[in-house]
Amino acid sequence: MALVPQSITYLDPTMKVGKQVVGLNGNMIEQEAVFAKLALREGVSRMYPFELSGGMARRVLVSTALISHAQFIVADEPTPGMEMKDAVQALQMFRDMANEGKSCMLITHDLDLAIHVADRVAVFYDGRLIDVTEARNFQSPELLTHPYTRALFNALPQNEFRHYSKAEVEQFLMTKEGYDVRY
């Protein structure tokens, strides 16, 4: 198991990032290949974390998990601070890993990115799991069975940013059979 932590402060400020990525299980050839796929230019491996931009540091954290050959990766908000092309590439690498029979749990607020690489999407509200649906169901709101999940879909920029009040959200949760905001 490997973790892509949410905070870039998990990088050791006293150690060059290449050495951190290689760690105990990797090698320089693998590290260079993963860095190249994540658009981390030559020379980044010889830098300290404080010399990196936020997006570069996040890509280094993703590299650390990918080079570990873990069968399961937990990626906690891995893409904030990355340029869109870099975020898409990082998530595609997780998708490729899943296609090879490994698993990744992506924790994110970026529903737009997640639905393009995920098999399933788990929706939480107020710390509670309220829905699990196939990612492909986000192609059409009528495929989404839970009202709150539909509300999230409608709140996406391409769906006119439909805003729901807290009372409306709680009403959604109360009206769906088997879901109750109080449990």
Where are the regions that the model predicts?
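Q-loop/switch helix immediately C-terminal to the Walker
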Residues: 6-7, 13-27
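Conserved ABC ATPase signature
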Residues: 48-52, 56
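A short, proline-enriched helix->beta-strand linker immediately N-terminal to the Walker B motif
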Residues: 67-71
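H-loop/switch region of ABC-family ATPase nucleotide-binding domains
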Residues: 108-109
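A short, surface-exposed alpha-helical micro-motif characterized by mixed small hydrophobic
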Residues: 114-116
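Short catalytic/signature loops enriched in Gly
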Residues: 134-183
